[in-house]
């Protein structure tokens, strides 16, 4: 809510779509997607990945956006309204609604540690601190030192995030995403084009676009493609739902969801078109993922490419934009929840959540990997499943379809509701089970 007590809203459709893209485009697109494309056969991985993006984008993303707009609230009130309609009481829904809210806060706290690392490397790329490192061992030592002395950078990243959020949905979040997301794509596309003209980069494209039909019979290709698509689209019952709650009544949600899915996929592909050819230029295969790829192996490779110093600056600037827009979204559900539950002004709610985020974030920094695993393996898919069940099973078919099709000239076909109610909910449960059994798939 804004200072007058009215709920904040997006100033434009472009602002909403770019904010949702900013939420979806994150570290998974950059440090995980390229390595999975390389490891699981290029186009052999892309085929199931695109299938799952189409499924989730046309059901789960639409559902969370529509649920948010229908209830004009975050998960706690939204879930409560759903159970009140079905069984006459908000209490069970409100209790369950705390799961995605607390999950979003926990994920944001862990993510703030990573943002601190990124800020550290961004500064080092501009001061030349990365250029003098001789090999992977030197980069490993630097990253270990970064992780141990990250507090100032972590706090700096949090202060920038909180300042943007305190300015409001339209005045802060929307304007920040309108600036950072286009720049992210421009910078990464620029890197991709530059690398394409360097001798030896063609080998990298073969890793991306090669197709082995036999590989499609490997169940692990489908499992990891599902995990990549699911987590990349920011489905967790919190961020997309809360962004949807700021939508106007004349927003075409299915069209907006389609744009988010398309541009999130493009971001992942562009990242692959930068990272895989870069590794090929250095005569190396992409065998690493996660922080090790982004903070150790990739900087070592980029440093040795012609124009490496500038490439490092551009790369970490683009990564910073992706990280900040994702962190803003993760903190938005807890901030909005404080506003709704205690009728606080936005700056006060942001300050309280920010204090918790900084304090806990500094404390869990040494165990951030395990912290993030718990969030991504258990809490995020559970939140997504709860939101899907509340909207597609509890809310009611007629009202759910009315909200999804509102402002559309051509309503979605009869295929949508059963696809969302049965297949998407089933797939979300599968993500939760597979993640728990396998120790994570996304």
Predicted feature locations:
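Membrane-embedded translocation segments of transport machinery
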Residues: 2-6, 10, 174, 178-324
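Transmembrane helix-loop boundary segments of multi-pass membrane transporters
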Residues: 32-49, 68-74, 117, 172-180, ...
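A generic transmembrane alpha-helix motif of multi-pass inner-membrane proteins
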Residues: 151, 364-391, 409-442
């Amino acid at each position: 809510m804004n200072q007058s007590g009215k709920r904040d809203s997006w100033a434009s459709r472009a602002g909403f779509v770019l904010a949702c893209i900013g939420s979806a485009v994150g570290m998974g697109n950059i440090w995980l997607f390229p390595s999975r494309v390389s490891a699981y056969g290029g186009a052999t991985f892309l085929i199931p990945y695109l299938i799952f993006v189409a499924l989730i984008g046309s059901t789960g993303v639409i559902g969370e956006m529509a649920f948010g707009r229908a209830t004009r609230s975050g998960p706690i009130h939204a879930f409560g309204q759903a159970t009140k309609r079905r069984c006459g009481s908000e209490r069970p829904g409100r209790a369950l609604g705390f799961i995605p809210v607390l999950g979003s806060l926990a994920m944001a706290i862990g993510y703030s540690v990573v943002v601190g690392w990124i800020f550290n490397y961004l500064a080092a790329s501009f001061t030349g601190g990365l250029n003098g490192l001789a090999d992977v061992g030197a980069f490993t030592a630097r990253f270990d030192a970064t992780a141990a002395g990250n507090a100032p950078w972590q706090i700096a990243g949090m202060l920038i995030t909180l300042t943007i959020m305190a300015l409001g949905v339209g005045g802060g979040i929307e304007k920040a995403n309108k600036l950072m997301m286009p720049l992210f794509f421009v910078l990464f596309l620029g890197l991709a084009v530059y690398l394409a003209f360097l001798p030896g980069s063609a080998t990298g494209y073969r890793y991306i676009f090669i197709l082995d039909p036999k590989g499609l019979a490997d169940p692990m290709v489908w499992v990891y493609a599902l995990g990549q698509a699911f987590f990349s689209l920011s489905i967790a019952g919190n961020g997309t739902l809360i962004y949807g709650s700021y939508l106007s009544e004349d927003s075409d949600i299915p069209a907006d969801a389609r744009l988010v899915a398309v541009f999130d996929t493009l971001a992942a592909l562009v990242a692959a078109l930068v990272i895989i050819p870069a590794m090929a230029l250095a005569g190396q295969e992409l065998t690493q993922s996660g922080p090790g790829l982004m903070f150790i192996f990739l900087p070592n490779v980029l440093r040795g490419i012609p124009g490496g110093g500038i490439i490092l600056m551009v790369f970490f600037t683009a990564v910073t934009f992706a990280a900040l827009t994702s962190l803003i979204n993760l903190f938005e559900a807890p901030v909005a929840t404080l506003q709704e539950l205690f009728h606080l002004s936005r700056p006060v709610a942001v300050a309280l959540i920010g204090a918790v985020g900084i304090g806990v974030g500094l404390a869990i920094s040494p165990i951030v990997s395990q912290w993030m695993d718990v969030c991504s393996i258990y809490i995020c898919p559970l939140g997504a499943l709860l939101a899907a069940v509340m909207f597609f099973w509890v809310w009611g078919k007629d009202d759910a379809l009315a909200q999804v099709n509102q402002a559309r000239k051509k309503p979605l076909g009869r295929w949508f509701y059963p696809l969302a109610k049965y297949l998407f909910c089933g797939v979300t449960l599968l993500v939760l089970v597979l993640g728990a059994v396998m120790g994570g798939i996304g």
